[in-house]
Amino acid sequence: MQRRGALFSVPGGGGKMAAGDLGELLVPHMPTIRVPRSGDRVYKNECAFSYDSPNSEGGLYVCMNTFLAFGREHVERHFRKTGQSVYMHLKRHMREKVRGASGGALPKRRNSKIFLDLDMDDDLNSDDYEYEDEAKLVIFPDHYEIALPNIEELPALVTIACDAVLSSKSPYRKQDPDTWENEVPVSKYANNLVQLDNGVRIPPSGWKCARCDLRENLWLNLTDGSVLCGKWFFDSSGGNGHALEHYRDMGYPLAVKLGTITPDGADVYSFQEEGPVSDPHLAKHLAHFGIDMLHTQGTENGLRDNDIKPRVSEWEVIQESGTKLKPMYGPGYTGLKNLGNSCYLSSVMQAIFSIPEFQRAYVGNLPRIFDYSPLDPTQDFNTQMTKLGHGLLSGQYSKPPVKSELIEQVMKEEHKPQQNGISPRMFKAFVSKSHPEFSSNRQQDAQEFFLHLVNLVERNRIGSENPSDVFRFLVEERIQCCQTRKVRYTERVDYLMQLPVAMEAATNKDELITYELMRREAEANRRPLPELVRAKIPFSACLQAFAEPDNVDDFWSSALQAKSAGVKTSRFASFPEYLVVQIKKFTFGLDWVPRKFDVSIDMPDLLDISHLRARGLQPGEEELPDISPPIVIPDDSKDRLMNQLIDPSDIDESSVMQLAEMGFPLEACRKAVYFTGNTGAEVAFNWIIVHMEEPDFAEPLAIPGYGGAGASVFGATGLDNQPPEEIVAIITSMGFQRNQAVQALQATNHNLERALDWIFSHPEFEEDSDFVIEMENNANANIVSEAKPEGPRVKDGSGMYELFAFISHMGTSTMSGHYVCHIKKEGRWVIYNDHKVCASERPPKDLGYMYFYRRIPS
């Protein structure tokens, strides 16, 4: 029976088609239409490949099977790749509110149930506009359109699916860490916790487990002040379980993890309750051991009242307040909206995408990266980097208002707001999802995020192209045994130069002393504070402090076969193409209060560090014997190593990340963690020291019997690792060669999505295709690659640099405050302050935190 009343559009703008044909159109696609489950992420605010939204001119298309969203330019790509034909098209129409009798009324919302969770444009005054939301189903490839809501005419399953999509919450709210942080229970021991009056005071640094030498994953027992290491399986970090043993011996229930204490709280664990807990009296319990966690929490932003006025000038100078700054528009002048303490990410990404190598690697390869992206591009690093880079560089989201367009819009009574600035919400959600700090809404250290990003770029490099190579350099470390005078030269990889602040070299010491006396007097008499006097530090003094020898704690002398005093000096074994300099402004006082050196350093526009070039072993120097220190593995770790061979897929990635951030090759870090049985980064580090001279040190982990991602495909026997034919068929149906599909699946443990990533990241495959076919056909082949291990990739050159960008921080610590970025483009400085991009009039180069230099060609 023909349904009555419903009509839908026919492509080409022709007539209408009767509703009775709705069922016939949807029947072939019914198996692909899903109702979102509780764990599904439904994207209806933002395209997976661009920053298009329902506010965009073309609206947004939500796939009714994957619930991914696509702008008009990208929906066809998803249709071709997946064959999914049914999409929900979402469009928001905005009009300026008619003034008069209705003036001052609340904005008019039509179809109010459609976009309950749609983000509003913060730049628009909602009192001035009304909007109408439109939703319809679109069937590809013929673009049949069915208006929604259409309860009477659509099949029940389709109606339920549409309602579920329209009422779903944002996927970012689902993964907001505050959701689970608030669910941590209050410990039943917190109110009446017994604390021993034993005189223990905990220093702000230099901690070590009281029962072993571990210096990471340390926990402070809140009863007796013991500092002991945690268990490796608690939070995926290394430890020998001495904190748990102490609880079993003494029964003291609560411990706090050192290194997580902030004015907002800390990680507290209850051994008795066997899980994370909250302690409402944590400040008092920490104060018992000399830790004043609330010392910086006098105001909402975490600053003491006395800290506010002295810092006002810093905020004004860095943001160039009081100066009328000219807004900048167009390619390369797009801002990033602040998601709430996300300015550290925005500043780093603006600097990163001002570098041509990153522009070419991602935006330059956009069609290829997007075409070969995995089925869920929101969970792919390269796709999201490309999306962000295109958003920043295309100019598509940074357009100046044009008078003629404004007049035309007024005549049509429809407002088409220009989108200035993009929201990095999808990018931040992905790059921070495995990091406990970056995934929070708290302020973070821009330097730490920079290293985290470099690590992700390294792990997800596109074939042989790795844009982070421009930052990589080799550091030569010379360690001298003070007792025998013998030396050892080693090299390590680094990505930035950390420059100490030479406070003792201040050129205005008399002014500083006078200011400090006046400040204390004003505080004592509750008078206004004097105008801030900032220490002026010569850059040359900081450079000299970097070159000075450092004492080495716990140095093991191979000449003495025992621990001894040692001194270390560092030099550049190679100079990077781009030099990142971090000014070490942040520290902790003895009272545990985070402090920032409020200094002015005369950073040069032209930098010459050629004199810091490493020279290697000098005549007359005698090398320390090449003897490694003994590896000490705890007894419980030995038992676990003897009795259990872990699966390569279970490798503790957090320990791998810790080691990789020290500069060791990623595959070497994976092997170190694997062969030490997931016993923590400390033990794995010792393994690296022992094995780093071996020829296969940096080669991928290859375990007989496993075909994981780390295993070399050339080390497998032909039929031992044959992938299922149905998965091979899926890949070949996408246009890839069969032998290409087989090799990709063998290299990724038969994981379909990872295999597609592998194919895209190995463009050199075709050159070796004949060899792969021969290997596949020969079931008894056992060919092992004899390629030499690849050393660190560095781009050495001269030590002459010019400044092109710097990131500045305002506030007293990395846990609070604000970041902005200045970049020199087209001969002039530009300030990037979240979504605001303006020409800089007075760039505060002396107050920066991170500086980006590019090498001057010799």
UniProtKB/Swiss-Prot annotation:
Entry annotation: catalytic residues: 343, 818
Biological-process GO terms, alphabetical: autophagy; cell population proliferation; maintenance of unfolded protein; positive regulation of ERAD pathway; protein K29-linked deubiquitination; protein K6-linked deubiquitination; protein K63-linked deubiquitination; protein stabilization
Residues where Zn(2+) binds: 209, 212, 229, 242
GO molecular function, one term: cysteine-type endopeptidase activity
Protein location: Cytoplasm
Residue list for modification Phosphoserine: 112
Alphabetized PANTHER family for the sequence: UBIQUITIN CARBOXYL-TERMINAL HYDROLASE, UBIQUITIN CARBOXYL-TERMINAL HYDROLASE 13
UniProt free text on domains: The UBP-type zinc finger has lost its ability to bind ubiquitin and USP13 is not activated by unanchored ubiquitin. The UBA domains mediate binding to ubiquitin.
Function: Deubiquitinase that mediates deubiquitination of target proteins such as BECN1, MITF, SKP2 and USP10 and is involved in various processes such as autophagy, endoplasmic reticulum-associated degradation (ERAD), cell cycle progression or DNA damage response. Component of a regulatory loop that controls autophagy and p53/TP53 levels: mediates deubiquitination of BECN1, a key regulator of autophagy, leading to stabilize the PIK3C3/VPS34-containing complexes. Alternatively, forms with NEDD4 a deubiquitination complex, which subsequently stabilizes VPS34 to promote autophagy.
Assembly with partners or alone: Interacts with UFD1. Interacts (via UBA domains) with SIAH2 (when ubiquitinated). Interacts with BAG6; the interaction is direct and may mediate UBL4A deubiquitination. Interacts (via UBA 2 domain) with AMFR; the interaction is direct. Interacts with UBL4A; may be indirect via BAG6. Interacts with NEDD4.
Protein name: Ubiquitin carboxyl-terminal hydrolase 13
Organismal lineage: Eukaryota, Metazoa, Chordata, Craniata, Vertebrata
